[in-house]
Amino acid sequence: KSARGLRFLGCNELQIGSLDALEGMTELETVCLAGCGLWSIQPLSSGKKLRNVYLGRNNVSDLSPLIGCDIAEMYLDLNKLNGNSEAFRGLTVHGFIVMNGNGYAQEDLEYIRSTINGEADLEI
């Protein structure tokens, strides 16, 4: 049976390293991928139904594959965003983003909010 209709994926702490197997999974709504050793989330770009994205404790620096999703919850704590305020440009978030441990300061939050479509609560 095909997994292409998969809506929820939980692989926390599995050190999978790559999301290539998720390419083309357009029905995903929730991904729990914390602590998986990920550098790229590019295969998530076809999952425009994503609402809940848990990517804490990885090595992600590019969030652009999530453009086009309407995100409700996103955990990005302890990744490699390195204080890059432009990393959020074009994302749509109607909910919150947890982004502590990525080099952001309180004074960065207003600018980051201005690059996001929607109403996002930001937590550092």
What are these regions (language model features)?
Residues S2-S61, P65-E107, Y111-I124:
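Concave beta-strand-loop units of leucine-rich repeat
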